[in-house]
C-alpha cells in the first residue's frame, strides 16, 4: 500500500516551528500526493527555564518527547536542530537525513551601547550571556576579563533581556538568528580561531523509525551530501569522547576536494585548559576521521578534563 501521510513531531518553540515548517514545505513539493502534518510539543528542555542546561544534565533534553511519539507510532519523523540530537539514539530509531547546513558560526549580538565594540575589545567586566558550556569555556580562555552569565529562554526572550540591559552582549548561533529573521542583529561572526561551533550546529537532523524504507526514501530528498559528511565526522568525534550536548566540546569542519578537514577541541569550564587539534582524511570516511581526532585529543588529556566536568555534574 502506497504511503499517504507523514506525521512530523516537532518542538513547539518558534525556531523549531520555523525549521519544521520548512521541512514540511519541502516534502510537500517533492511528494504532493502525501498528506504531511505536524504535531508540536514541549520538551523537558523547553519546560525547565530556571536551571542552567548543564545542571539539568540530560543528553536528550530537547528530543526525548519527540522520539517517544515515533516509538509509539504517533509520528513518522522528528525534526531536530542537529546540535541537540544525542549521538546515541533510542533502539529502533535512526538519523535518516541531514539537511543543507546554514553558517554554523557563533554570533556576537550586542546591546546598542556596545555597537562600536567587537568581541576582542569589549571593556573588561562586560556581561556576556550564554547558556552553552562550550562557548563559555572557549571565551573564558581567550577573554578572562569578561563576566559570563547564564541566559535561558527562546531567542526573542533572550534578545529582550539583552536590549533591556540585563546583558551587554549575547553569544547565539548565527543560523538560528537568520532562520528567525534576526540576521540584522548579528554584530560579529565569531572566528573559529576563537570559538569552535557545536557538533551539527546549523544543520537539521531528521530522525525516523528504522526499517521504514518508504519514509526514508521520502526524507532523503532533503539530504545534503557535503553537510552530511561534515556532520557525521563531527558526531563521531563527539560520540568517541562520550560527550553530550552540554559539554565544552567544539568542532570545525570543511571539505576541500576529496579531503575532509576536522578540527576539534575540549576545554575545562574555567577555560584554563584547552586542547585542540586537527585531522584530515578521505571525505568518504568521515566517521573514521572523527574517531581518530577524538583519540588524538584523548592522548593529550581530553578525558581527564571531561571527567572533572562529569564528576561536577553528578555531584
UniProtKB/Swiss-Prot annotation:
Keyword Transferase among UniProt keywords: yes
Cofactor-binding details, from the entry: Binds 1 dipyrromethane group covalently.
Role description: Tetrapolymerization of the monopyrrole PBG into the hydroxymethylbilane pre-uroporphyrinogen in several discrete steps.
Signal peptide: none
Molecular function as annotated in GO: hydroxymethylbilane synthase activity
Entry's EC annotation: 2.5.1.61
Further comment: The porphobilinogen subunits are added to the dipyrromethane group.
Matches recorded under InterPro entries: HemC, Porphobilin_deaminase_cofac_BS, Porphobilin_deaminase_N, Porphobilinogen_deaminase_C, Porphobilinogen_deaminase_C_sf
Lineage: Bacteria, Bacillati, Cyanobacteriota, Cyanophyceae, Synechococcales
Family: Belongs to the HMBS family.
Single GO biological process annotation from the record: protoporphyrinogen IX biosynthetic process
Chemical reaction(s) catalysed: 4 porphobilinogen + H2O = hydroxymethylbilane + 4 NH4(+)
The protein's annotated pathway: Porphyrin-containing compound metabolism; protoporphyrin-IX biosynthesis; coproporphyrinogen-III from 5-aminolevulinate: step 2/4; Porphyrin-containing compound metabolism; chlorophyll biosynthesis
S-(dipyrrolylmethanemethyl)cysteine: residues carrying this PTM: 245
Gene: hemC
GO cellular component: cytoplasm
Cofactor: dipyrromethane
UniProt entry keywords in alphabetical sequence: Chlorophyll biosynthesis, Porphyrin biosynthesis, Transferase
Domain of life from the UniProt record: Bacteria
The keyword Transferase is assigned to this record: yes
Name of this protein: Porphobilinogen deaminase
Assembly information from the UniProt record: Monomer.
Any matching Pfam family: Porphobil_deam
